[in-house]
Amino acid sequence: VVLTSNRTRELSDALRRRCLYLWIDYPSFEKELRIVLRKVPGISQLLAEQIAAFMHLVRRLDLQKVPGVAETLDWSLALLRLHRDHLDRTSVEETIGCLFKHHEDQRLVRGPWLDAALAAIHEAQRDGEGLARALSRIERTLKA
């Protein structure tokens, strides 16, 4: 038997004593990229990289509900069905409900952070730096 918890309410001590505990963190950029490429047939490498990078960065924000891999896949499918080949402000605005279920989270992402994050992602791809290597630099830039 496998029990899962999204931490919306605490499990009792008695139940915890009878269980083995395993914490599964959000995937790395590389792992999430592989998941998107495998689970979303037809998605381009470029868009999949941008999505994985965006998700990596958005999970660093102080959100009420951090989107998980299920939301990443829903969002990827929505973007693909809308025939998007790259992330831009319009694409994010039109599909933001796939990722964020709280208005406050949507408002936070729609602010100046969105333009800065997208610009940094596109710049890293243009420069050939590689998003995996660029993410820590981008994180520092967005915090400043």
Question: Model-flagged regions — what are they?
Answer:
Residues V1-A144:
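C-terminal regulatory/interaction module of P-loop NTP-utilizing enzymes
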